[in-house]
Every structure is written in structure tokens, then in C-alpha cells.
Regions:
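Second-shell residues forming the walls of enzyme active-site clefts
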Residues: 84-222
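Glycine-rich, aromatic-flanked loop segments that form ligand/cofactor-binding clefts
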Residues: 1-19, 39-65, 85-109
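Glycine-rich, proline-tolerant flexible connector loops at the mouths of alpha/beta enzymes
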Residues: 62-75, 155-166
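Glycine-rich anion/phosphate-binding loops
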Residues: 29-49, 80-88, 130-134
Length: 222
């Protein structure tokens, strides 16, 4: 389930209203210690409530950068600075682990620098690998080093890296995430019913393409 907080919180009735991750980042800018403490508390609360309802994990936290480009990410992201995202995500995941829940970082390798919404079209990020590596990949690399259990791929095309969108890309999943970053956890596709995934063909073809690229678990949600 997506139980991020803010505008993306699927369970609301009888669940605590969780703040958007960006509001945690704003507190962090004012007081680092209080921001990190709030991140950990929110991670614990989200996870504890879901666990009590019988759910094993949430697709959280968002590791994308908060930029002016992406309204679909926007306040779902902790911060604009990669280092701040990494520190806040580590605190949030520590709270989740206190509640005995695995974490899933998303949307690899970064959805924050495109304007299009992958729910309705395929976003295209024209940056080269170096620019992505120096910014968007920093939180993912940091969380892999911290032992995050899962990573969700993005339905975003990075044509200077691969002709396939990240969720269908062996370069992103096998070469970058697995070989270079040495991620050994579970790779999830994003929802294959999203418009951003339509380039994969029919649902069976989308599933085969995602599996062939290196995804371990596929989501078809709508």
C-alpha cells in the first residue's frame, strides 16, 4: 500500500493523519534534530498502524528530490538536497524498523526532475547519467548502503542512458542498482497499469519486460 502521508495516504479512516514528507523537511531546515526526530516518529507511526491492521509493508519512503518541476512528486519528497533526503529517509526507515516493517524506497532512479505525471503519460528526463548520479541517485545509494529492503522503479524514460524506461531497463536495474550500487533486496515495478508503462505493450508483455529487466515483484493495481 502507499501510506506515505500527506496527499498519498490510502488508509485514512481510523488511521492517524500523517504529514507530507516535505513538511518534515521544512522542520529539518529549521532544526535538524527535531526534523530527524519527526521523520523517525512518522516512520514508526505509519508502520505500527499498518502492522496492527495486518499489512506487512508500505511503499515508503519516497527518495525522489523535491523540485519545482514535478507536481506529482512535489511535497511527497522530503527535500531538494540529496544529502538531506538521505538523512531524513534514514531516520524515517529507522522508525519503520522499530515497528518491524521493511522499507521500499521509490522511484528509482529519480522521478523528481520531470514535469509529466507517469500516471497519465511517460515522462522523459533528458539529463545524462552523470547529472542523475550526482543528484537523484545519491539518496538511493545512501539507503542501499543502509540496507533498505526494497526499491521501486520509476516509469520514466532517460534516453541518454537507455531507450527503455527505468522499470523495463536492464541498464538501470541490473547494471546500476544491482552491480554498481550492490543492492541485494527486492526490486518492485511501479504499477504496470499506469500510462507510463504502456510502452511495454499488453499487460502480459509489460510483465515479461519488467521481469526480464530485473524486477522481482510486479504491481498491477488498477
Amino acid at each position: 500500500v502507499d501510506q506515505e502521508g500527506g496527499r498519498v495516504q490510502r488508509f485514512r479512516s481510523e488511521f492517524s493523519e500523517l504529514p507530507a514528507l516535505a513538511s518534515i523537511g521544512e522542520l529539518y531546515d529549521k532544526d535538524h534534530d527535531r526534523g530527524l526526530a519527526l521523520a523517525r516518529d512518522c516512520g514508526w507511526l505509519m508502520a505500527a498502524e499498518l502492522r496492527s491492521a495486518g499489512l506487512d509493508f508500505s511503499f515508503a519512503p519516497v527518495l525522489d528530490l523535491r523540485t519545482a518541476y514535478s507536481s506529482i512528486i512535489g511535497d511527497r519528497a522530503f527535500h531538494a538536497l540529496p544529502g538531506a533526503v538521505t538523512r531524513l529517509a534514514r531516520a524515517y526507515v529507522a522508525g519503520m524498523r522499530d515497528a518491524r516493517m521493511a522499507a521500499v524506497g521509490k522511484h528509482f532512479p529519480g522521478h523528481g526532475c520531470v514535469t509529466a505525471d507517469s500516471h497519465v503519460e511517460l515522462p522523459v528526463d533528458e539529463r545524462d547519467f552523470y547529472d542523475i548520479e550526482q543528484a537523484d541517485l545519491v539518496p538511493f545509494r545512501g539507503m542501499v548502503e543502509s540496507g533498505i529492503e526494497g526499491i521501486m522503479t520509476a516509469h520514466v524514460l532517460y534516453p541518454k542512458v537507455d531507450r527503455h524506461a527505468a522499470g523495463y531497463s536492464k541498464i538501470w536495474i541490473e547494471d546500476v542498482l544491482r552491480a554498481d550500487m550492490r543492492f541485494e533486496g527486492v526490486v518492485f515495478s511501479d504499477d504496470l497499469s499506469m500510462a507510463g508503462a504502456e510502452a511495454g505493450g499488453c499487460y502480459a508483455d509489460r510483465a515479461q519486460a519488467a521481469l526480464a529487466a530485473g524486477c522481482d515483484i510486479l504491481l498491477i493495481c488498477n
